[in-house]
Amino acid sequence: VGGGIGHLSAWLFDLWCGEPSDEKQNIDLKPDSFIIVEEGARFGVIIDRLIRRYNAESWSRVIAKPWSEITAEVTSWSAAAASLPSSARPSDIPLPVSLIIVDLPDSERPDAASSAFDILSPDGLLIVPEPEVPTGDVGFPEEGKEPTEAQTKVIAFNKWISFIKRVSENHSVSFVELSGGTLAVIRRIA
């Protein structure tokens, strides 16, 4: 989620497919399917070219929609078609999902992680960078005004803490420190 201009996607395609110009490589590590969600249609076109560069059209695709819209549709269709076999359920994303990587701006990350966790399969993994930890006194948002950038960080981080508290009660949560931040790895327990 959050394909950007494809840096992470390109790295994963290199891992799964090898260098596209080296025809002698025979790497078969690719997943059954790989769906890249990118809200911006412009970046979606760039990622689509990346998919074609790696000849990955048969198992990967890009969806140019907001993540919140996709998860709302997937959840609704799943509930409406619960009695149908999974192959007959219309959805942008086949459920359940075994791995979701969220790479969105800090302010969007907590809500995206929460909705991603909701469609994760039992034993599925969610990988998401922790939002930046806010520092200093930022005051309170004034009524009728947009919060400042610092206040938005605090709001996002508080949502993140609430999400982590909720999922850590019954699921496995790990944190890995990286240069420039912390990566959260959340495993949904069956």
Regions found by a protein language model. Give the residues of each.
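Amphipathic, non-transmembrane alpha-helical secondary structure
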Residues: 10, 14, 75, 110-114
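Short, hinge-like loop/turn segments at secondary-structure boundaries
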Residues: 16-17, 52-56, 79-82, 144-150
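SAM cofactor-binding core of SAM-dependent methyltransferases
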Residues: 1-72
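C-terminal substrate-binding/active-site "lid" region of AdoMet-derived donor-dependent transferases
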Residues: 93, 106-190
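Short aromatic-enriched loop/helix-cap "lid" or pocket-rim segments at secondary-structure transitions
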Residues: 49, 76, 138-142
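A short acidic, Gly/Pro-enriched loop at the edge of an enzyme's catalytic core
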Residues: 75-99
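Switch II (G3) loop of P-loop NTPases
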Residues: 100-106
